[in-house]
Amino acid sequence: MTFSVDKVRADFPVLSREVNGLPLAYLDSAASAQKPSQVIDSEAEFYRHGYAAVHRGIHTLSAQATEKMENVRKRASLFINARSAEELVFVRGTTEGINLVANSWGNSNVRAGDNIIISQMEHHANIVPWQMLCARVGAELRVIPLNPDGTLQLETLPNLFDEKTRLLAITHVSNVLGTENPLAEMITLAHQHGAKVLVDGAQAVMHHPVDVQALDCDFYVFSGHKLYGPTGIGILYVKEALLQEMPPWEGGGSMIATVSLSEGTTWTKAPWRFEAGTPNTGGIIGLGAALEYVSALGLNNIAEYEQNLMHYALSQLESVPDLTLYGPRNRLGVIAFNLGKHHAYDVGSFLDNYGIAVRTGHHCAMPLMAYYNVPAMCRASLAMYNTHEEVDRLVTGLQRIHRLLG
């Protein structure tokens, strides 16, 4: 199948609008991607003609809604090549998935004197839950430091492991730098030391295929809204043997086998014991449509197009005076930068006046900002619906801002 960015753009209604009298150039997909009509329509159709509570009744609408929900679980398992659909838990997003692991597996397996390894490039969602866990149990949080080029100092990693290391929690792709970490060697090293591995895949799954069996990670988590799906839905993958051993984190309906006031409560089997309460069924349906949409385009086709676009963008940005780029040459999805001494918010505001949407701030990565000694950065995201013309507009906009502000 030949990838056509024009055909892809036609599926995204918002891309036809104007901002400040100019065509929208949406370069903020790493924060949250836009939604194709196929996703919007699938969720709307479900609410119009097929909505009912799942796992709640024997009537037709409930049975059909339950079947649709479980079919999405199966589709998601194929998307990341899990061994079984029952290794996947529906969560609100990457943040909840990581917190689930920290509060279920973590509370059961991390003790005083143990340690967890993260990196200096992590999103706060892959820092704070582990800080909280370590504070609760008296464990130590160890950090893989950064290199100036935005890669990790992997030579330090072997010395961070010891017999008390319980977990390596690492991002697949940095949400600021676009660095893709060498997971295979990191996971192998962790397993050699008896540690489990959690991978934050929020910035990876939309850019190229992910195979959790080939990676051999123990946990993998991602969000639907960055994958052209709805907000409020994500996937947590856990190896089946681990998942079956994990206790529930939240209590309520759907996650129980029996409830007795005198004899207590027993849990249903995984993954359903981690899905207390009425789920975001509409969001799950929309996620299924997003997975179907991306799969039909072909992740390898998407990867090839986006990489060509990234190479073009990096080469064109070299023409902007006083522009500082952060991260390695080989990267996925994002370009973080600052223009001279101007605050990222000011640069982002000017770009918005030109119809260009970029993200500004610390990007939920304050330790990374501290490493580079800046309060904030601008971040342009490149997704499958972005074009060379939009890159040119970004470059022209930055050149214009430099002329205006000096």
Swiss-Prot record:
It comes from the Bacteria. Pathway: Cofactor biosynthesis; iron-sulfur cluster biosynthesis. Keywords: Cytoplasm, Lyase, Pyridoxal phosphate, Transferase. Cysteine desulfurases mobilize the sulfur from L-cysteine to yield L-alanine, an essential step in sulfur metabolism for biosynthesis of a variety of sulfur-containing biomolecules. Component of the suf operon, which is activated and required under specific conditions such as oxidative stress and iron limitation. Acts as a potent selenocysteine lyase in vitro, that mobilizes selenium from L-selenocysteine. Selenocysteine lyase activity is however unsure in vivo. One of its GO terms (molecular function) is cysteine desulfurase activity. Belongs to the class-V pyridoxal-phosphate-dependent aminotransferase family. Csd subfamily. Gene3D superfamilies: Aspartate Aminotransferase, domain 1, Type I PLP-dependent aspartate aminotransferase-like (Major domain). Homodimer. Interacts with SufE and the SufBCD complex composed of SufB, SufC and SufD. The interaction with SufE is required to mediate the direct transfer of the sulfur atom from the S-sulfanylcysteine. This is Cysteine desulfurase. It is found in: Cytoplasm. Its EC number is 2.8.1.7, 4.4.1.16. It catalyses: (sulfur carrier)-H + L-cysteine = (sulfur carrier)-SH + L-alanine; L-selenocysteine + AH2 = hydrogenselenide + L-alanine + A + H(+). The modification N6-(pyridoxal phosphate)lysine is found at residue 226. The active site is at residue 364. Pfam families: Aminotran_5. It comes from Escherichia coli O8 (strain IAI1). InterPro entries: Aminotrans_V_dom, Aminotrans_V_PyrdxlP_BS, Cys_dSase_SufS, PyrdxlP-dep_Trfase, PyrdxlP-dep_Trfase_major, PyrdxlP-dep_Trfase_small. One of its GO terms (cellular component) is cytoplasm. GO terms for biological process: cysteine metabolic process. Its cofactor is pyridoxal 5'-phosphate.
